[in-house]
Amino acid sequence: MSQRPNSPPATLSWGGSRMRRVLFHVRGIPIGSYPALLYVGLVCGFYVMYAVAPSLGMHRVSAAVATLILFAPAIAGARIWFVLDHWAIYRHDLRRIWRHSEGGMTLYGGLVFALALSPVVLAALGLRFAAFWDGATFTMLTGMIFARVGCLLNGCCSGRRSDRWVGLRLPDDTGRWERRYPVQLLELAAAVVLLSGSMALLAVGAPRGAIFAVALVGYAGARLAIDPLREPPPRIAAGRRVALAAFLACTTLASVVGWLATGR
């Protein structure tokens, strides 16, 4: 999810409706659509973990506590990965790095950071690595669905111009309207499909770790297909394929280390 330096209007028209960058105000403080929907996604994802934990052989409270603890490195990692990938922009204005009013988070970094730190947390709470990350898959995909709605309202993660039948008139993060590939909706659809597949695997009693592995491969495949449709970001540090390869390598390594560290 990315956003450029200029601040576009808080409300954008879309046909007869409006796309709201700012959903509401709390004591004069504007609450942006992306952070608000991300928060809703995290809350819903937390309760999804609480619901599926027994089906994965985990105690509800232990799984919920681990999820809450790992939210912190996940959010920080998602932001850090994005900033490093766009360092050419952020190095000129360091105050923007942790500015909550703008977007800029990457799932890659969040998952890698949380995976790397999870063995310590899970061992302390007596949770199995594979079972927990199967449950966390539901949390992440649920959060992703809400976050992509936030991206759509905010205009970030926009698609590039489309002259084909696959396209909607949408704004980018600067408020420029044109017919684009609806990248946010495509990612939302991918998350729904992966979430449905994960539910099916849980229902048939798939081996522990299978849900996480299948979702990871499915997400990587979806990104390979969708990323070429995105609006090219300005002065990005690394290619998207390179970033995806690094993400898969780091995730695989962290998963192996976590599995061995917990012994299960």
Predicted regions and their residues:
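Hydrophobic, membrane-interfacing alpha helices
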Residues: 3-264
